[in-house]
Design a protein with these regions (language model features):
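Extracytosolic ligand-binding ectodomains
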Residues: 1-170
Length: 170
């Protein structure tokens, strides 16, 4: 196969990648945000592509401030899960500040967000559709290159940027 997409989390993805490598499968492997920690096994994961909703190497000032504060406190770069938790916490805090502590007030604030006036999170601008699903957050595809998640992939003509390194996921 040319491309193999594996839906799943880190543990199952690594089992599949290891077995595929053992059997000599020559394919591009692609996974979602549950794959972020696969960089810890550089032999199995090298060359795989990982979808993520956050790029710690992003250029926006809010992303840089969040990444620096996170690194200063935890001595590692934040991953998408940390960024999503940060955005969710800030979003609820903003809703409470605007509409009070009631569930209906928080819901009202979240429903008031629009594409023209979204919540500006570190994962991107966020608003919600009529069903309450988040819309507008960013999505990045990174490639595992020598134990790091690299934005743009290792074969990009632009200079690749390290998003997270293997040592940060152990």
């Amino acid at each position: 196969p040319g491309i193999v997409f594996v839906a799943g989390r880190e543990e199952s993805a690594l089992r599949i990648l290891r077995e595929a490598r053992r059997q000599g499968v020559q394919a591009i492997f692609l996974g979602g945000d549950g794959w972020q920690g696969i960089v810890s096994d550089t032999a199995a994961a090298n060359g795989a592509y990982v979808g993520t909703s956050f790029n710690a190497a992003g250029r926006k000032p809010a992303v840089q401030r969040f990444t620096k504060a996170f690194q200063d406190k935890y001595q590692t770069k934040p991953d998408a899960f940390a960024a999503l938790a940060y955005d969710a916490t800030r979003l609820v805090a903003e809703a409470i500040a605007q509409k009070g502590r009631s569930r209906s007030g928080v819901r009202e604030h979240l429903a008031s967000l629009t594409p023209a006036e979204p919540f500006q999170g570190v994962t991107g601008p966020i608003h919600f559709n009529a069903s309450g699903d988040p819309i507008g957050m960013g999505f990045h595809v990174a490639q595992v290159v020598d134990g790091s998640l690299v934005s743009g992939g290792g074969n990009s003509r632009s200079r690749p940027t390290v998003i997270a390194a293997a040592s940060e996921h152990r």
